[in-house]
């Protein structure tokens, strides 16, 4: 019995990669220094995985920004606008990631989307010229040879041709048709080069196979691989899937020329049933994904061994594997000195999951009952308390009307128009303002008890004053307090709710250099005291203009935390919804007229198969949001915000959230959502983000005016709000002020024309 992992976190034990790249962005280090830091990390990770006794060690899973972009660059799928900048390869790569504004030109970044049902974001490759598609990159070969120098025969990992093709945004059908042929030739050349290097195994990741596949999808997959697998020669190919099961294509895969199939037994609801129904091919190896790559709880060896025993009825050729990349979990529990051992023993981050794979291999390869098995089973005895009877009773007492807001949207809109007295095309921001070093230092000093609560509060109040003043000077219509007290929109609420646990160093990559530290939902959730009330009241006292109350919604708190596995996601979400509802009502009672409840991650846990959307998710996720705001008066305006997902196919459900205003990311996706909003007669007022805050470039007044005009061509002027596409926390003040001034100027200019 051997073991394997799909891929490993690349940010490093202490986010070394993030800091190395950011230094390069700030011109504080050279290209050579950045590449050396990256190589050092790769070597450290390979040695760590090797030391843990993993048999199939991945290479090419490392990335300076995003592995989808890496695959696109490998095959020269780079839009002409980036080629025309005439930058070197590294800076062209980062121009695609972040946009570019300088002496060589001014271009926006590639669109960013959620990676399937995770909180990782990938960059959408753009292809406007298929003629240039070819194997021009060498990253996959270089990194294989780096590992080889360490004495490691690695398994290069690459996004498969079918998934990559499905993720690319093509200019038109003609380009797409040519790209199909060119990309196939490029993959064939890749196979040839890997054969020249005498590579043993290549892992091709095809997560797109876990979606609902059409006949056309299956035909395309077969067309690609019937040709491609004829060119594998001595190279062994592992087809790796994750985030679901392969029900639409599994029987065909058994007949294919793949040497191994990687199946997910955590999220793949039908993976075991498919094997029980169709068996497994004698000429293939089963890479069994039984270590959860998306959650942090320790593996129960009894359950894993039971699964292996069942699988062995159908094949003896089994490799123990992770269910998906370990990118989605933190690096190691080694760095958690503050978390009580009664909790910590039940957690397994990436490094600990390597140990779990090693243990399981050893247990399966030994004849008598192994002490490793007994030690694992001991973990699950005497678990700390999780239940709160008051929370259970409150959930039980909920009635149908608790999930419905009255009066109707139409009636509320008239009442709010009279009450709020906002101009046409009201301008606002999404919530957070830049967090400078002194803001972070103040928060850290307070956490470490180096300053008093009074000093901490006074510092933040001064920052709020400055933030309100800046917004008033710019001329925004609806203000925010800036969120200087918050480290992260989910972690902050978790810290102030009962039922959550926190790590010191549990960082996970969200995109590029952005890392998040998800809280852990351990027990029943409740609010013991107001969370944002004092900050919102203080901010509102500073201005005659409306200052929004800012909250994070229950679905996002759930989706951006590591969830419990002992109760349903529905129950966890409703517990959080009741806690946030209490906060909403406190804000309203304090005179806060607009309350924003962000649901940035609404789409994240939406099942990948449409047949499961409602029964497994939307039927409880949308009502949970309704529960949060259903108790407010008609005159109180409820906003929500969503970002970096595809919403076109769930807009009716989003409308059913019954918010009064929704803002969403639209700038990177070229406002393509607006046509759908128009088509379904979306009732909610909308703020399609008019510029991309994830890029350092400052949009001009002309550019913003054109964007606003585009929006006005699609939607009624009474329905539109003008705002950036996301919070401004990660940007510098000079970029923010310049961009917002241009936003207000452009809006005023357009108002004069209406």
UniProtKB/Swiss-Prot annotation:
Keywords: Amino-acid biosynthesis, Metal-binding, Methionine biosynthesis, Methyltransferase, Repeat, Transferase, Zinc. Its EC number is 2.1.1.14. It catalyses: 5-methyltetrahydropteroyltri-L-glutamate + L-homocysteine = tetrahydropteroyltri-L-glutamate + L-methionine. 5-methyltetrahydropteroyltri-L-glutamate binds at residues 15-18, 114, 514-515, 560, 604. InterPro entries: Cbl-indep_Met_Synth_N, Cobalamin-indep_Met_synthase, Met_Synth_C/arc, UROD/MetE-like_sf. L-methionine binds at residues 430-432, 483, 598. GO terms for molecular function: 5-methyltetrahydropteroyltriglutamate-homocysteine S-methyltransferase activity; zinc ion binding. Pfam families: Meth_synt_1, Meth_synt_2. GO terms for biological process: methionine biosynthetic process; methylation. Binds 1 zinc ion per subunit. Zn(2+) binds at residues 641, 643, 665, 726. HAMAP family: Meth_synth. Belongs to the vitamin-B12 independent methionine synthase family. This is 5-methyltetrahydropteroyltriglutamate--homocysteine methyltransferase. The gene is metE.
């Amino acid at each position: 019995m051997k073991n394997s992992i799909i891929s490993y976190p690349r940010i490093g034990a202490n986010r070394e990669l993030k800091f190395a790249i950011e230094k390069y962005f700030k011109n504080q280090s050279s290209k050579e220094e950045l590449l050396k830091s990256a190589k050092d990390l790769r070597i450290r990770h390979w040695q760590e995985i090797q030391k843990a006794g993993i048999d199939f060690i991945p290479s090419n899973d490392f990335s300076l920004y995003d592995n989808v972009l890496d695959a696109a660059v490998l095959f020269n799928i780079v839009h002409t606008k980036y080629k025309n900048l005439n930058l070197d390869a590294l800076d062209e790569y980062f121009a695609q990631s972040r946009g570019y504004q300088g002496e060589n030109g001014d271009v926006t970044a590639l669109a960013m989307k959620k990676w399937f049902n995770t909180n990782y974001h990938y960059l959408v490759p753009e292809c406007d010229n298929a003629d240039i598609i070819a194997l021009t990159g060498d990253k996959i070969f270089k990194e294989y040879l780096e590992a080889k120098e360490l004495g490691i025969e690695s398994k290069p990992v690459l996004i498969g041709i079918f998934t990559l093709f499905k993720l690319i945004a093509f200019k038109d059908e003609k380009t797409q048709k040519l790209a199909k042929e060119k990309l196939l030739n490029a993959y064939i050349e890749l196979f040839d080069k890997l054969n020249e290097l005498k590579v043993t195994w290549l892992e091709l990741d095809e997560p797109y196979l876990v979606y609902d596949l059409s006949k056309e999808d299956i035909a395309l997959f077969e067309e690609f691989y019937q040709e491609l697998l004829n060119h594998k020669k001595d190279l062994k190919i592992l087809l790796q899937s994750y985030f679901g099961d392969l029900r639409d294509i599994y029987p065909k895969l058994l007949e294919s020329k793949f040497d191994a199939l990687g199946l997910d037994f955590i999220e793949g609801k039908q993976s075991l049933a498919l094997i029980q129904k169709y068996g497994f091919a004698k000429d293939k190896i089963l890479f069994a994904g039984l270590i959860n790559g998306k959650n942090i709880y320790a593996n129960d060896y009894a359950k894993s061994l039971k699964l292996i025993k069942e699988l062995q009825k159908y094949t003896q050729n089994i490799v123990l594997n992770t269910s998906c990349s370990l990118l989605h979990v933190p690096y190691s529990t080694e760095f958690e000195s503050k978390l009580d051992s009664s909790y910590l023993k039940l957690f397994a981050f990436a490094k600990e999951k390597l140990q779990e794979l090693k243990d399981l291999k050893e247990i399966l390869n030994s004849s008598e009952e192994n002490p490793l098995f007994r030690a694992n089973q001991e973990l699950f005895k005497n678990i700390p308390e999780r239940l709160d009877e008051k929370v259970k009773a409150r959930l039980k007492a909920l009635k149908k009307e608790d999930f419905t807001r009255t009066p109707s949207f139409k009636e509320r809109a008239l009442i709010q128009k009279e009450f709020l007295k906002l101009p046409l095309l009201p301008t606002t921001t999404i919530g957070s303002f830049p967090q400078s070093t002194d803001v972070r230092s103040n928060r850290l000093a307070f956490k470490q008890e180096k300053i008093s609560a009074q000093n901490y509060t006074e510092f933040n109040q001064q920052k709020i004053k400055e933030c309100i003043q800046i917004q008033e000077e710019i001329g925004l219509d609806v203000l925010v307090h800036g969120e200087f007290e918050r480290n992260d929109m989910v972690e902050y609420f978790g810290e102030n709710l009962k039922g959550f646990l926190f790590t010191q160093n549990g960082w996970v990559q969200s995109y590029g250099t952005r890392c998040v530290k998800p809280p852990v939902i351990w027990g029943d959730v409740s609010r013991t005291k107001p969370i944002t009330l004092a900050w919102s009241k203080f901010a509102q006292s500073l201005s005659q203009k409306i200052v929004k109350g800012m909250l994070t919604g229950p679905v996002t708190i759930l989706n951006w935390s590591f969830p419990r596995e002992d109760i349903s996601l529905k129950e966890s979400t409703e517990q959080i919804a009741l806690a946030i509802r209490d906060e909403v009502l406190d804000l309203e009672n304090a005179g806060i007229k607009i309350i924003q409840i962000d649901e940035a991650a609404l789409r994240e846990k939406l099942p990948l198969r449409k047949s499961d959307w409602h029964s497994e998710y939307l039927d409880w996720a949308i009502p949970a949001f309704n529960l949060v705001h259903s108790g407010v008066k008609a005159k109180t305006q409820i906003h929500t915000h969503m970002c970096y997902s595809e919403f076109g196919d769930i807009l009716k459900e989003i409308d059913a959230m019954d918010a009064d205003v929704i803002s969403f990311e639209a700038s990177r996706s070229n406002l393509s959502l607006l046509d759908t909003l128009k088509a379904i007669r979306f009732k909610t007022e909308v703020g399609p983000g008019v510029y991309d805050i994830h890029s350092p470039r400052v949009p001009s007044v002309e550019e913003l005016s054109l964007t606003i005009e585009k929006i006005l061509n699609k939607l009624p002027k009474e329905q539109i709000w003008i705002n950036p596409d996301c919070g401004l926390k990660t940007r510098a003040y000079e970029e923010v002020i310049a961009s917002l001034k241009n936003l207000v100027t452009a809006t005023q200019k357009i108002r004069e024309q209406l």
